[in-house]
Amino acid sequence: MSIKISRSLYADMFGPTTGDRVRLADTDLIIEVEKDFTVYGEEVKFGGGKVIRDGMGQSQVTNAEGAVDTVITNALIVDHWGIVKADVAIKDGLIHAIGKAGNPDIQPGVTIIIGPGTDVIAGEGKILTAGGFDSHIHFICPQQIEHALMSGVTTMLGGGTGPSHGTFATTCTPGPWHIGRMMQSFDAFPVNLGISGKGNASRPAALQEMIEAGACALKLHEDWGTTPAAIDNCLSVADDYDIQVMIHTDTLNESGFVEDTIKAFKGRTIHAFHTEGAGGGHAPDIIKVAGLKNVLPSSTNPTRPFTKNTIDEHLDMLMVCHHLDPSIAEDLAFAESRIRKETIAAEDILHDLGALSMMSSDSQAMGRLGEVITRTWQTADKMKKQRGSLPQDSGDNDNFRVKRYIAKYTINPAIAHGVSKLIGSVEQGKMADLVLWSPMFFGVKPDCIVKGGMIVAAPMGDPNASIPTPQPVHYQPMFGAFGGALTASSVVFCSQAAIAGGLARKLGIAKKLYAVENTRGGISKKSMIHNDATPAIEVDPETYEVRADGELLTCAPAEVLPLAQRYFMY
């Protein structure tokens, strides 16, 4: 016997279904469910008097026979490929299936088998996303990693050795010894990690030894001298080893202008950091490279989005990060040349057009690593308010815009850095790095963070209380963040050459090493999902006005942002 219920009651019980719309936190962004993989009347739900009980929604199938380890029930998946309702299965630390969970002995349409060995995470009324990937990390202090994880970031790539002055300014881990010690420390942290070696050298030998020592990328930074010779050499070595190169170009234009840097690229693929320029790069026109087919451009989050306070905070921030002295006129001029309201405003619009492909933090070095996800959605909301719906959206929802923006901190950095076969999206066969959100807290405060199939972090109440919810509630590491579970549920990225050379044995690393691949000629701007636009970008050297395909790109700074103070009163 079947029974009809209202859509609102159904959504309360099992979460939204096809055609239902959901607001993302306090933004103006609205998503609409495109498809529901569950079966009406056969939904599975855990709890007293609910469906997932022996002989009902739970079968007798063993895990060895095909039952899954964990099922996230009735979740609303938001990913670059779609916005759909489904049950999500996890098995052996991987995403096993996306579909309909239950007991195939008595239920129709079951594609995910629940057995006695299956645990349940309730996803009803929740949004499920892939874990975030921050590809611009200054490893200044280990405490960063917990802050990033609690925000929903499960993968971090960058360079540094701790609070050295080289690390304060540059995302580079220099030399085999430092790389080895940093990689050994990574066994302590429940996230995927990768090291970028220093790429500033005019001859290949020093770069080769860093890659073979474990670097999964090389970073060219102006503070170490990003000359055309260093650029050319670094890209040549990267081509030989199939690793990515990230670049922070020459703000002072000492060794050449943006055209000289582009010439040194020789059409080769490169990841351009803070492409707008406030974080560093040829003044005032580094933003031009966002229109090139071989450049994979990203932003760092302090300029995201452009607000009434953005300019004021940047000058002091820059002086500290780059070891400058405000009493020296040349240092002050260097700082002021980088902070331009015109290019920061254009950055907002280039993100909305899909010309800027990725978002990152620049952690503690002109960036806030716990705010990559929040600032991505603040930018999307600001653009919705100022520019209206995108042409690809119907007007009733913002599905395409949401897919464009979520790709900026999930799948696109994974593609850029050669790890998209393992992470970056909610897809079958990938590592189960997943984040569950309540819609009202989307992009700000996750409900649960799953790493390699195991809950690794979550908000938790008083451990001495009789139930999990009494105040004070804090984000805390969970069992997946300890002991052997930690090292079994995350990886360290490196080059194939490092693995072939027996690096794990040499360093005694417990985490699995994962080789990056397809980072060079096999990818280009066209590989950046929903963010592959290549407009012709021009910058007026006198006014700093930015035009894309002849159109002036400008917008007002935001006076008020969503996902801000109302979420952080305590």
From Swiss-Prot:
Carboxylation allows a single lysine to coordinate two nickel ions. Pathway: Nitrogen metabolism; urea degradation; CO(2) and NH(3) from urea (urease route): step 1/1. Residues 131-570 form the Urease domain. Heterotrimer of UreA (gamma), UreB (beta) and UreC (alpha) subunits. Three heterotrimers associate to form the active enzyme. Its cofactor is Ni cation. PROSITE patterns: UREASE_1, UREASE_2, UREASE_3. One of its GO terms (biological process) is urea catabolic process. It comes from Rhodopseudomonas palustris (strain BisA53). Disulfide bonds: none annotated. This is Urease subunit alpha. Ni(2+) 1 binds at H136, H138, K219, D362.
